[in-house]
Amino acid sequence: MTRTRSDSLAAGGLNWDSMPLKLFAGGNAKFWDPADIDFSKDRADWESLSNLERDWATRLCAQFIAGEEAVTQDIQPFMAAMRAEGRLGDEMYLTQFAFEEAKHTQVFRMWLDAVGMTDDLQCYLDDLPSYRQMFYEELPASLEALATDPSPAAQVRASATYNHVIEGMMALTGYYAWHRICVDRKVLPGMQELVRRIGDDERRHMAWGTFTCRRHVAADDANWEVFENRMNELIPLALSNTDDSFALYDEIPFGFAKEEFQQYAADKGMRRFGTISSARGRALAEIDVDYSPLQLEDTFAAEDSRVLATSA
């Protein structure tokens, strides 16, 4: 691509009130360093768990770190799609997004090292066929497609896959599980801080995905059907991952019930439809400064806090 101008030099400068740059500024303001998290108490807490509990938690952590690594590797075509569309603000935000995914990979690996889980953990994913289909097939295929087809429809498919199903259902459900483990048992303070920090980052990631789908739906109503179809394809796969995880254990640790996590994941997925649908027929200029995607993620976080405070 030949460069002909610099958008940062345009009259009026950059629109700092636009959603992507609002998220970019928020990420800068909330910067954190994994090395600052104290994992020193987590080793003793980890060893106080039963073998069954450690096995379950290791599988949960393996899914997280492998997922963070996958997105670190797969997200680049979305940046190129933003460049092809001439959206500097989105491109700036996605550079931060990619950095944060790499940082999340780092911090989960640091935690595993701190609690002594240094063996090969790949086996913890071998018995999770839905997880492997999502991360080994659906995610890379939908993002790599943007390298040759950066169209709005392809962007909506990619965002629905990652931001709405993987982050917006699977990851949120996993964070909820970590909160239940840590808060109910009053253990693993380092993991609690790790999840709090990552959750804050990923609320911005999900908000960007919602914003991206909303602006494409506002521009062309046909993209609503693209979003709806992709979500309906993948939601059953996301819920199946919960089935796969619970099916591996005759005895379920931590007092967990499969139905609780299925309901949690389904609720988060279904509520995303309304936020995207509300953009239909809207003016693009309105969508660009509409912060409802971020407000939705903050609402989810506040709801979780209330539930966990009740169970503590």
Curated annotation (Swiss-Prot):
| Entry GO MF terms | metal ion binding; oxidoreductase activity
Q: Which GO terms describe its biological process?
A: deoxyribonucleotide biosynthetic process
Q: Which co-factor is required?
A: Fe cation; Mn(2+)
**Record's keyword annotation contains Metal-binding:** yes
Q: Which NCBIfam families match?
A: PRK08326.1-2, PRK08326.1-3, PRK08326.1-4
Function per UniProt? Probable oxidase that might be involved in lipid metabolism.
Q: Can you say what this protein is called? A: R2-like ligand binding oxidase
